[in-house]
Design a protein with these regions (language model features):
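A Rossmann-like FAD-binding core segment of flavoenzymes
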Residues: 1-13, 18-19, 81-169
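Short, conserved acidic/polar surface loops in the N-terminal third of protein domains
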Residues: 8-10, 23, 34-39
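Short, well-ordered coil/turn residues that connect adjacent beta-strands
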Residues: 22-23, 28
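Glycine-rich dinucleotide-binding loop and its adjacent helix/turn
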Residues: 28-81, 86, 167-174
Length: 174
């Protein structure tokens, strides 16, 4: 399956046909394919890459992995759910990519003891009832019912280039 530009038109190849079109609408989402961490246990059903409903995690131990707005917003939303134990793990020592208001809300909940912050840290293993996190050269094993990985996405860059789509990378400010 492919899309290539050909003389001002697009040739769209699917598993069933080849079509020509003057325009093509790509509905691939904003993030593309979620970025995985390639850690043992990441294929368990308790691992997701986007939080849909914080209520589904009521009374659970939840690990959120990431340092951008999606991760901070997920942790903050989970903190509002009764009896939920939230840990946020991020590989860097500070949140360079998250908006100030998200960092401030997170800091407040960390001070209140609603969110445990582990940074810099690295998720090393996911088990059915626990996770192993490396921090300060020490592995901590935490009870765990769910893992939400907010590590961004991988765009289909080569596919888009072949289709004649010009891309420009822009970086936000903290």
């Amino acid at each position: 399956d492919d899309i290539v530009e050909d003389g001002g038109e697009f040739v769209v190849r699917t598993s069933k046909a080849v079509e020509r079109a003057s325009a093509v609408l790509l509905a691939i989402g904003r993030r593309g394919t979620p970025r995985t961490l390639d850690v043992p246990g990441e294929d368990l059903p308790k691992v997701v890459y986007q939080m849909i409903d914080p209520e589904q995690y009521r009374s659970q131990h939840v690990l959120v992995v990431g340092g951008g707005d999606s991760a901070l917003e997920a942790a903050v939303q989970l903190a509002a759910v009764q009896d939920t134990v939230i840990t946020l793990s991020y590989r860097a020592g500070h949140f360079a990519r998250a908006r100030l208001n998200n960092r401030e809300r997170l800091d407040q909940l960390v001070r209140q003891g609603r969110i445990r912050l582990m940074m810099p840290s690295e998720l090393k293993r996911i088990e059915s009832n626990s996770v192993d996190i490396l921090q300060d050269d020490k592995i901590s094993t935490l009870p765990n019912d769910a893992v939400i990985i907010c590590a961004g996405g991988i765009l289909p860059t080569e596919f888009l280039r072949r289709a004649g789509i010009a891309m420009e990378t822009k970086y936000g400010t903290p």
